[in-house]
Design a protein with these regions (language model features):
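Bacterial N-terminal signal peptides that target proteins for export
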Residues: 2-18
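C-terminal motif of bacterial Sec signal peptides marking the signal peptidase cleavage site
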Residues: 25-28
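Bacterial signal peptide processing site
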Residues: 30-32
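A short beta-strand-turn-helix
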Residues: 50-70
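Short active-site neighborhood of thiol/selenol oxidoreductases, capturing the structured segment around
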Residues: 63-86, 90
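Thiol-based oxidoreductase modules, predominantly thioredoxin-like and allied folds used
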Residues: 103-117, 133-142
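Short, internal strand/loop/helix patches
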Residues: 123-171
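Thiol-/selenol-based redox modules, centered on thioredoxin-like
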Residues: 149, 159-205
């Protein structure tokens, strides 16, 4: 009897957790595919597209990468830890996927610090991790505010010790769209390439 009571409590707790995370997460708990990262399929709280210039000035949208899984990361080139670590993890993940699968993945680095991240600097920094990676730079403050609001990304300038210096505090996570352009995953930083490889394989199958 006691075991049954605890069983009911456990099941109720699980269902409440799924309900709290949203109906789309509940579906993800019950149906394949079983992602290792947070499944946000169907969650309308996040943006579904973007229109941002790349380092050559060409405006890119999700439609430019039709047929590819798209990884969208928000960061900045002067970032001391999270940003280069995430880019390195993604670079390693593509190597582990193999060349054929890697061609079907597009990594986008959206700067939250366009003041310092000039097209030239961004154009050197991002492809250094992998030649296929693309840097996107909001053209002005309004465009930066729009894309970060659409994807619920936090960012703030933090003054440094030296006069005029600063760092950027920002959401340390990535968004992943599937090959049909649907937003599917929210990926927190610092997990290593393993979960990336696992989930990208599911999206590419």
């Amino acid at each position: 009897m006691l075991h049954s009571w605890f069983g009911r409590r456990a099941r109720r707790g699980w269902l409440l957790a799924c309900a709290f995370a949203g109906a789309t997460l509940l579906a993800a708990c019950d149906n394949a595919p079983k992602f290792q990262n947070l499944d946000i399929t169907g969650n309308t709280q996040f943006g579904s597209d973007f229109a941002l210039p790349d380092t050559a000035g060409k405006v890119r949208t999700l439609g430019d990468f039709k047929g590819k899984a798209v990884v969208m990361f928000f960061g900045y080139t002067h970032c001391p830890d999270v940003c280069p670590t995430t880019m390195a993890e993604l670079s390693e993940a593509l190597k582990q996927l193999g060349p054929d699968a890697a061609k079907r993945v597009q990594v986008l680095f959206v700067t939250v610090d366009p003041e310092r991240d000039t097209p030239a600097l961004l154009g050197q920094y991002v492809p250094a991790f992998d030649p296929s990676f693309i840097g996107l730079r909001p053209a002005d403050d309004a465009q930066l505010k729009k894309v970060t609001k659409d994807f619920r990304v936090y960012y703030a300038k933090v003054p440094g010790k030296a006069p005029g210096s600063y760092t950027m505090d920002h959401t340390a996570a990535s968004y992943v769209f599937d090959t049909n352009g649907k937003l599917r995953l929210f990926v927190r930083d610092g997990q290593g390439p393993g979960p990336w490889v696992h989930d990208l394989k599911l999206l590419l199958d």
